[in-house]
Amino acid sequence: MATAVASQVAVSAPAGSDRGLRSSGIQGSNNISFSNKSWVGTTLAWESKATRPRHANKVLCMSVQQASESKVAVKPLDLESANEPPLNTYKPKEPYTATIVSVERIVGPKAPGETCHIVIDHGGNVPYWEGQSYGIIPPGENPKKPGAPHNVRLYSIASTRYGDSFDGRTTSLCVRRAVYYDPETGKEDPSKNGVCSNFLCNSKPGDKVKVTGPSGKIMLLPEEDPNATHIMIATGTGVAPFRGYLRRMFMEDVPKYRFGGLAWLFLGVANTDSLLYDEEFTSYLKQYPDNFRYDKALSREQKNKNAGKMYVQDKIEEYSDEIFKLLDGGAHIYFCGLKGMMPGIQDTLKKVAEQRGESWEQKLSQLKKNKQWHVEVY
C-alpha cells in the first residue's frame, strides 16, 4: 500500500481510517437515533432515474435487505483482461474528480459509533481490483501547510471491480466517522475530528470528491486457483476488502473466475448493531453452505472461554486446529482492521503452534515465503 511495507506486511489505512486521529480520545459518533433495525434504506440513492443502472435493483448490501437467488451478470468483461492490477492511475497532484452517489449509515442505534457505506461514481475512469484502496483528498486547506490541500487518506475498497451496480462505474467505501472526545471533559472537540471521514459521511448525492489511486497489492485476491481456501479476519471497517472478495466469489457471474473453494470470514465488532454487511454475508451461508463460513466475535455481547470479552483471536483459538490444517494445505490468511488486533492474534497463533509442537516463527516465515500471509492494518 502507500505506507510502510515490511516482511509482506503492508501498514496502511483500510476503510474507515482517518490518519493523525488515532488517539484514545477518538470515538465514533452516534448522533443518529433509530428505534429498531429498520434504520437501513431500501435502495441505493442514485442521482436520478435516468442514470440508474439496470442492475441497481439487484444490489445487495446493508442498504438492501434482500438476497439474490442467482449470480448477477457483470460488464464490461474487459476489466478481466489485464495481467497486472492498475496502480496509481491518479496521483495526489492530479486527482480524479468523482461524484458521490449515496451515503448510508449501516450500523444500528446501539453501535458505539457511526459507519457509512458510500458509493462513488468514477465513470469507469479509475478501475481497480478487489483488495486495493482509493485515496481521498477532502476539500479545504491543510492546516499544517497553508495554501496546500489536505493529505490523502486511504480507504480500502468495499466492492468488486464492477461496483455495487455491476457495471464497472462505481466504487464503494466503508467509512467510520472519526469524532474526537476530550478524555478529561468527555465533550466533543470538532476541531480534532477526522477531516476526511466526516467529509465523506456528511456528503450528499451529487457532491464531488477527489480520488487518487488505486493503490496496494498485498491484499489482492489470488485467483490462480479458484478452489483455494481463503481465511479472512477483520475488525470493524477492516471487513471492506473481504466484502469485495465475497461478492466476486458468490454474487457476480464472472466467466473468468468460478470460485469453488472455501471462504471463511471472522468478523470482530462491539455488538450486533455494529455488524457490517451482516445480511449480505448471511445470505451467502444459505446459498453456498459448502463454500462459505462466517463467525462473529461480539466483544460486548459474547464471552470467551475464560469469561472475558470475545475477540477475533478467541475465535481463532476456538478453531485453531482447523485453521492450522488449512494453512498447512496452502490456505491464504488475511488480516484487516485496527493494528491493535495483531499482537493478540499473533500471541494466540504462537500459543497454538507451540501446543502442536511447532515453531510459530518458522511457520510464519514459511507462510510469508509462500505468499499465504496478507496483512493490512492501521
Swiss-Prot record:
Cofactors: FAD
Residues at which FAD binds: R153, L154, Y155, S156, C174, V175, R176, Y180, V195, C196, S197, T237
Catalytically driven reaction(s): 2 reduced [2Fe-2S]-[ferredoxin] + NADP(+) + H(+) = 2 oxidized [2Fe-2S]-[ferredoxin] + NADPH
GO CC term (a single one): organelle membrane
SUPFAM superfamilies: Ferredoxin reductase-like, C-terminal NADP-linked domain, Riboflavin synthase domain-like
Signal sequence extent: none
Compartments (UniProt record): Plastid, Chloroplast
Span of chain positions assigned to the transit peptide in the UniProt entry: 1-62
EC id: 1.18.1.2
A Pfam family the protein falls into: NAD_binding_1
Induction, per UniProt: By nitrate.
FAD-binding FR-type domain mapped to chain residues: 93-221
Subcellular location, principal: plastid
GO biological process, any: photosynthesis
Biased composition, class Low complexity, residue ranges: 1-17
Span list, region Disordered: 1-27
MF terms (GO), sorted A to Z: ferredoxin-NADP+ reductase activity
Enzyme class: oxidoreductase
Alphabetic keyword roster: Chloroplast, Electron transport, FAD, Flavoprotein, NADP, Oxidoreductase, Photosynthesis, Plastid, Transit peptide, Transport
InterPro entries assigned to the protein according to its UniProt record, in alphabetical order: FAD-bd_FR_type, Flavoprot_Pyr_Nucl_cyt_Rdtase, FNR, FNR_nucleotide-bd, FNR_plant_Cyanobacteria, OxRdtase_FAD/NAD-bd, Riboflavin_synthase-like_b-brl
Pathway: Energy metabolism; photosynthesis
Function in brief: May play a key role in regulating the relative amounts of cyclic and non-cyclic electron flow to meet the demands of the plant for ATP and reducing power. Is involved in nitrate assimilation.
Protein family according to the UniProt entry: Belongs to the ferredoxin--NADP reductase type 1 family.
Protein name, per record: Ferredoxin--NADP reductase, root isozyme, chloroplastic
Species of provenance: Oryza sativa subsp. japonica
